[in-house]
C-alpha cells in the first residue's frame, strides 16, 4: 500500500518539516545504510538477509512495521571498496578455513577495500559532498529527511559490538540533548535483541558524535537520529580473537539483528520521532529569527570558481542561496557580484548552516575521534561575514552553474592570465599541452591601472606555433572551457617589470609521477590523484613504490610523495636523489619530509615539544597522550607571497587545516 502512495507519503513527510503538516498520523522514515567502508563487509552481507526478510516475511510484527515505515535501503554505500575486499578475501580463501591472523586473507594489499575508487574515506564526505556516490546519497537524504539513519561499520577483531550513543562529552553542542536521549532509548532495543542471541556489546565509549561529516552524526544536525553500529571484524571468513574464534556469519548475524532492532524501535517510537523532527525544524526557524543579522555573505573577488564550489555544496544540502545584488564592501572586505553569494539565516536548515560557518574554539573534551574544526569558508580560503543583511541579496538561485569568464579581447602582442583562479592550473595545462610557450611573473606589475600579481601567466603572441588569429581562438576556447579570464594587452611596457623582463620565467610542461603503494597513505594519495585527474585534467602517473627501483624517472619533471605511514623504504632514496640532481622537482607531504631529511635530499629541522607532566595515573595515560594530538584543526599562517608556492593567494596570510603535530622550523634564510 505504501508503494502505491509513496509520492504523497514523501510530500507529507517533507511538508511536516516545513511546518505545513501537524500531527504524527503518518509513516516514519528509516534510512538503513551498510558498509560505507568496503572492507567492513558484514554490513552489506547482512543487508541482503534483511531485505529478504522484509520482502518474504508474513509475520504480523513485520507486516505492521512495513505498514508504518518507509525504508530507504542502501545495501552497499561503497561498491568499489566492497568489490576490492570481496575479491581479495575470496581469492585468498582456504578450503579449510584458517583463523590464523597472519594468513594472507586477513592482510589486504594496498590500498585495501576501505576506500572508494579514488581512495577517499566516503564516511567523511557527508558534509563536503565531493564524490558521486555521496551526491546521490545526500540528495536522497534531503529529499526524504529520514527520522533514523543507521550506519553499519566494523572495528578491530578483538572488540565486540558497539551502538550509539557515543562518549557523552564528545557530542557536538549544536546537537539537541533530546537527540541523544532518543538515541539512548533506541539503544535499549539493540541491547535487548543482542541479549536475546547472547552477543556482547557496549555503548557510550570509544566513538563520538562531533564531526557532522560522518554518516552517524550528519543526521543529528538535520532533524534525524544518526546511529553508528560497529561490529568486531573477521576481516575475512574466520579469525582468532580475544573473544574466541570470530566467524563471518557471526558478524553478519549481529548486523542483521541491529537492523531488525532498529525497525522495531522505529515502529514503537514512531510518534516520538516524528514529533521530534517537527519540533527540531520549528525550533530552527525560531532560533534563526532571533539572530541579530539576517544573512551570511561569502566570496572572493579574485576567484569566482572557489566561491561557486562552496555555494554548490550548500545547494546540494537544500540550503537557499542568493546572488549578491551588487558589489559590496563589508568590514574592509570586498565582495563582487558574480563572485560572492548570500545565505539567508531564516530557513529551516539554519542549524546545518551554523555548523558549516561557525568558528568554535572551546570544547568540553580535549579528545576527538575525528576532526574538531571544519568551517567551510575557511576551507575554501574565502572572505565571509556572518553578520550581513538580506538587503544585499539578489535573486535566489534555483540552480547554480560556475560563473562564465569574460571574453578574451584580441591582442597582436600578448595575453595575461591571473594565477589566483582555482582553475588556472587547468587552463595553463591546456595551453602547454598545445605546445604554446608561457611564462610566469615573479613580481607584480601594473598595466593601464590594472594590477597583476605574483604568478600571472604571460602568453606572448610572437614566435608561437599558431597564427595570431588561431592563438586568439584557442585561448578563447580555453577560457570558456576552464572559466578562467584571459586578457589581451597591446604593449609590454608596465609599471614594474616589463613583459620582456627576466622576471618572467618560462614554464615547462609538467610530467607528474605520484608515488603510491606500501608506506603511503591512500587518503592523501587519492586526494592528489582526484584533484589532478578530475578537477585539473592533468595526467598523472601513479608510480608504485615497488617500481621505483626500475622505473625511468627521467620521464617525469615532478615526483610527489604523499604522506607516508609505517615504514617507507629508504631503498628508493638513491634513484630519487640522482633524479633531483638532474633537475627534477620533488614534492613531499607531511611526514614524508622526515624521509626526505633522513635520506639527505634536503636538510629539514623539526621542532619538538617534550611532555613534562608527571603523576599521570595509569587509567589516564591513554587520554593524556591522545590529548596531545591534532585530529583536525584550522590555523592561520603568515605567508611570504613572493615565494612561488604562494602564488595566486591574495593575502599575506592563509588558513590551513592541520591533522598532525609535525612542525618544521623556518628556513634559515627566511
Model-based region annotation:
Residues 101-120:
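Aromatic- and acidic-residue-enriched carbohydrate-binding clefts of CAZyme catalytic domains
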Residues 151-152, 561:
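Conserved beta-strand positions
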Residues 46-47:
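Active/ligand-binding-proximal structured segments within catalytic/core domains
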Residues 75-80, 89, 152-160, 592-593:
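Short, solvent-exposed turn/loop segments enriched in Gly/Ser/Thr/Pro and often Arg
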Residues 88-106, 127, 131-134, 146, ...:
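Active-site cavity-forming subdomains of large catalytic enzyme subunits
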Residues 51-54, 68-91, 96:
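Carboxylate/His-rich catalytic cores and anion/metal-binding grooves
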Residues 1-41, 50-69, 118, 124-125, ...:
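Intrinsic-disorder/low-complexity accessory segments
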Amino acid at each position: 500500500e505504501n508503494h502505491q502512495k509513496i509520492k504523497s507519503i514523501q510530500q507529507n513527510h517533507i511538508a511536516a518539516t516545513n511546518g505545513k503538516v501537524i500531527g504524527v498520523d503518518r509513516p516514519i522514515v528509516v534510512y538503513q545504510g551498510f558498509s560505507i567502508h568496503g572492507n567492513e563487509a558484514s554490513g552489506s552481507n547482512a543487508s541482503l538477509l534483511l531485505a529478504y526478510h522484509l520482502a518474504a516475511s508474513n509475520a504480523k510484527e513485520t507486516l505492521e512495521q512495513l505498514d508504518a515505515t518507509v525504508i530507504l535501503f542502501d545495501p552497499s554505500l561503497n561498491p568499489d571498496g566492497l568489490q576490492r575486499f570481496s575479491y581479495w578475501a575470496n581469492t585468498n580463501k582456504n578450503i579449510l578455513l584458517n583463523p590464523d591472523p597472519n594468513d594472507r586473507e586477513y592482510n589486504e594489499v594496498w590500498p585495501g577495500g576501505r576506500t572508494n575508487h579514488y581512495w577517499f574515506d566516503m564516511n567523511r564526505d557527508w558534509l563536503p559532498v565531493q564524490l558521486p556516490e555521496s551526491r546521490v546519497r545526500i540528495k536522497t537524504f534531503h529529499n526524504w529527511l529520514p527520522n533514523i539513519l543507521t550506519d553499519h561499520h566494523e572495528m578491530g577483531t578483538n572488540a565486540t559490538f558497539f551502538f550509539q550513543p557515543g562518549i557523552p562529552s564528545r557530542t557536538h553542542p549544536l546537537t539537541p540533548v533530546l537527540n541523544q536521549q532518543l538515541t539512548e532509548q533506541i539503544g535499549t532495543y539493540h541491547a535487548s535483541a543482542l541479549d536475546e542471541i547472547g552477543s556482547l556489546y557496549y555503548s557510550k565509549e570509544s566513538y563520538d558524535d562531533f564531526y557532522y561529516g560522518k554518516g552517524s552524526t550528519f543526521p543529528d544536525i538535520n532533524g534525524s537520529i544518526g546511529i553508528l553500529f560497529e561490529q568486531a571484524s573477521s576481516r575475512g571468513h574466520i579469525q582468532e580473537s580475544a573473544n574466541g574464534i570470530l566467524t563471518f556469519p557471526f558478524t553478519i548475524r549481529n548486523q542483521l539483528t541491529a537492523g531488525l532492532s532498529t525497525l522495531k524501535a522505529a515502529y514503537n517510537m514512531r510518534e516520538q520521532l516524528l514529533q521530534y523532527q517537527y519540533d527540531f525544524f520549528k525550533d530552527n526557524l525560531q532560533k534563526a529569527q532571533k539572530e541579530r543579522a539576517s544573512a551570511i555573505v561569502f566570496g572572493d573577488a579574485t576567484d569566482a570558481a572557489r566561491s561557486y564550489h562552496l555555494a554548490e555544496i550548500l545547494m546540494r544540502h537544500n540550503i537557499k542561496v542568493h546572488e549578491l545584488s551588487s558589489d559590496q564592501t563589508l568590514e574592509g572586505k570586498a565582495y563582487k557580484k558574480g563572485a560572492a553569494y548570500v545565505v539567508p539565516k531564516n530557513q529551516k536548515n539554519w542549524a546545518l548552516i551554523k555548523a558549516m560557518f561557525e568558528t568554535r574554539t572551546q570544547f568540553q573534551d580535549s579528545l576527538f575521534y575525528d576532526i574538531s574544526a571544519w568551517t567551510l569558508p575557511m576551507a575554501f580560503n574565502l572572505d565571509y561575514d556572518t553578520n550581513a543583511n538580506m538587503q544585499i541579496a539578489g535573486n535566489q538561485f534555483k540552480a547554480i552553474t560556475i560563473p562564465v569568464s569574460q571574453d578574451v579581447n584580441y591582442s597582436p602582442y600578448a595575453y595575461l592570465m591571473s594565477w589566483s583562479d582555482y582553475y588556472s592550473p587547468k587552463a595553463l595545462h591546456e595551453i602547454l599541452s598545445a605546445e604554446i610557450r608561457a611564462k610566469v611573473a615573479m613580481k607584480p606589475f601594473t598595466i593601464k591601472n590594472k594590477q597583476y600579481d605574483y604568478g600571472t601567466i604571460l602568453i606572448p603572441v610572437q614566435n608561437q606555433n599558431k597564427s595570431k588569429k588561431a592563438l586568439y581562438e584557442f585561448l578563447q576556447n580555453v577560457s570558456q572551457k576552464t572559466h578562467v579570464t584571459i586578457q589581451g594587452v597591446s604593449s609590454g611596457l608596465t609599471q614594474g617589470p616589463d613583459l620582456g623582463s627576466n622576471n618572467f620565467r618560462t614554464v615547462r610542461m609538467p610530467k607528474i609521477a605520484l608515488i603510491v603503494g606500501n608506506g603511503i597513505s591512500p587518503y592523501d594519495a587519492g586526494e592528489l590523484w582526484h584533484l589532478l585527474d578530475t578537477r585539473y585534467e592533468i595526467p598523472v602517473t601513479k608510480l608504485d613504490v615497488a617500481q621505483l627501483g626500475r622505473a625511468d624517472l627521467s620521464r617525469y619533471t615532478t615526483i610527489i610523495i604523499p604522506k607516508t605511514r609505517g615504514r617507507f623504504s629508504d631503498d628508493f632514496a638513491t634513484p630519487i636523489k640522482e633524479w633531483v640532481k638532474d633537475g627534477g622537482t620533488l614534492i613531499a607531504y607531511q611526514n614524508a619530509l622526515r624521509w626526505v631529511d633522513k635520506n639527505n635530499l634536503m636538510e629539514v629541522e623539526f621542532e619538538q615539544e617534550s611532555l613534562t607532566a608527571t603523576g599521570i595515573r595509569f587509567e589516564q595515560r591513554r587520554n593524556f597522550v591522545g590529548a596531545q594530538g591534532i585530529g583536525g584543526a584550522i590555523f592561520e599562517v603568515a605567508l611570504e607571497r613572493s615565494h612561488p608556492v604562494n602564488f595566486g593567494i591574495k593575502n599575506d596570510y592563509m588558513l590551513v587545516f592541520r591533522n598532525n603535530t609535525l612542525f618544521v622550523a623556518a628556513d634559515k634564510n627566511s
